[in-house]
Design a protein with these regions (language model features):
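Pair of pore-lining "gating" transmembrane helices in MFS-fold secondary transporters
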Residues: 1-7, 86, 185-203
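Short amphipathic helix-loop junctions that connect adjacent transmembrane helices
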Residues: 1-13, 205-225
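Residue-level signature of mid-helix packing/kink "hotspots" within the transmembrane helices
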Residues: 23-31, 127-128, 234-242
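Helix-to-loop junctions at the C-terminal end of transmembrane segments
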Residues: 29-41, 239-253
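C-terminal ends and interior cores of transmembrane alpha-helices
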Residues: 51-74, 262-274
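Cytoplasmic helix-loop-helix junction between adjacent transmembrane helices
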Residues: 82-123
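Juxtamembrane intracellular "pre-TM" segments in multi-pass secondary transporters
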Residues: 165-191
Length: 275
């Protein structure tokens, strides 16, 4: 997104606004989709999220295409990109809560950790392959990775439609309980999660600009370099989750206390490095 935004004349703050609007929408809308999956069923909400994301990404890429062809000035493109990204995030937010809830419904209490781990592993594999494939596709054009992601999402939607069983009616809750972010049972975790992912978001939004400016890269070169750097980052995370974490017999909060200082050191090295 960073090199693509620069190609149409947007500056860093404007590109960051697009990403922030999307993230804020996901944060606000996800609880609604979680409750909706309790009422209308996991599979329906999951399909809404997958097909909706596909349509929203096509519109998002279409705005970029019009701007690249010169039909939109940067300000108009910015407004349309924010609107389409927010609309896209609104339906995309349905995917994660419905998929996790579906896994919880079809697994026993003993197998639930394995089931959720399978979802996490699938996400990590996607995080490894996605940036690498996107970086390679960017050599065709900066919009090609967006259109390719639409094809992948449509394939997932079709697979969900024809291969994912509909859960029995007994699993559907008519009046799901509401859980507020201010609930003292989860408030500390919510605050910690917000701060943690805020740090991740800052790095993800600025790393492409850093690479492009420090290494004097073109837009396509930036997409390739960032794609492969994200691939190696995701691969390292997956290896730690598979090989290190299972061998550590420590509580989750102890892991947080260990990992947070390591992350701070890593971010500091990234900030000071120039090559």
């Amino acid at each position: 997104l960073a090199p693509l935004g620069r190609e149409i004349g947007l500056v860093e703050v404007q590109i960051g606004a697009i990403i922030s609007a999307s993230s804020l929408t996901l944060f606000l809308v996800s609880p609604f989709w979680g409750r909706a999956s309790d009422i209308w069923g996991r599979r329906k909400i999951l399909l809404i999220g997958l097909f909706g994301y596909s349509a929203g990404t096509v519109m998002f890429a279409g705005v970029f295409q019009m701007a690249l062809l010169g039909y939109l000035v940067p300000l108009t493109a910015l407004i349309l990109l924010i609107l389409t990204r927010v609309a896209n995030a609104t339906v995309m937010a349905a995917v994660s809560p419905s998929a996790n809830a579906y896994m919880a419904d079809i697994t026993t209490l003993e197998d639930r950790i394995k089931g959720m781990g399978a979802i996490g592993a699938a996400g990590n594999i996607g995080s490894i392959l996605g940036p690498a494939i996107g970086g390679l596709l960017a050599s065709i054009s900066l919009l090609t990775p967006l259109y390719f992601s639409v094809l992948l999402t449509l394939a997932a939607a079709v697979l969900t439609l024809f291969a994912l069983p509909v859960l029995p009616k007994a699993t559907v809750i008519k009046k799901p309980p509401r859980l507020k972010y201010s609930d003292p049972r989860i408030l500390p975790l919510v605050v910690a999660g917000v701060l943690l992912f805020m740090g991740f978001a800052i790095v993800q939004q600025t790393i492409a600009f850093r690479f492009q400016d420090e290494l004097a890269l073109s837009g396509i070169e930036t997409a390739k370099v960032v794609g492969f750097s994200l691939m190696f980052s995701a691969a390292a995370a997956l290896l730690v989750q598979l090989l290190v974490i299972p061998r550590l017999s420590v509580r989750p909060f102890v892991l947080l206390r260990i990992s947070m200082p390591i992350m701070m050191i890593a971010f500091g090295i990234m900030a000071l490095g120039h090559s």
